[in-house]
Amino acid sequence: MATKNITVRNIPLADIQPSTLNPRKTFDQDSLNELAESIKENGLVQPITLRKTPKGSEKHFEIVCGERRYRASILAGLDNIQAVVKDLDDKKAFAAMIIENLQRKDVDPMEEAAAFSKLFTDGTMKVKEIAKMLGKSQSYVISRINLANIIPQFVELMND
């Protein structure tokens, strides 16, 4: 199997913006503070993944994977962050975001539901494809898509 050489670059934090595609919307401040302390003490263990922004954008790069590490690096007072820059369209970037976020144990069910629903309702992927890509059962994916379609007022109550 062929492997690609991956180049890790040092990118100024000021040149990076979070992605509006990121299904993760909540970040625990205490956890970010702990990660910032760890980064100060030990450095960044894993580089973040970026993609270039379209010409004319205020920032040069958009976060694909690693927004939590990005936020913690800012809290740690760093100027630069180690990153891998990939050439990804919206579909591939969104899929990478979902895959990375599902590796966490504390995935918010509503964020996961919104991400699955977006892939499905945009016509981007079928349930079977989402399940295969994420290593989940089709019934699990369907239940999350259904969760995303519950009454908006109920979602608001759950998030409070």
Q: What name fits each language-model region?
A:
Residues 1-86, 97, 103:
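Short, charged/polar connector segments at secondary-structure boundaries
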Residues 71-160:
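Amphipathic, charge-rich alpha-helical segments that serve as recognition/docking helices
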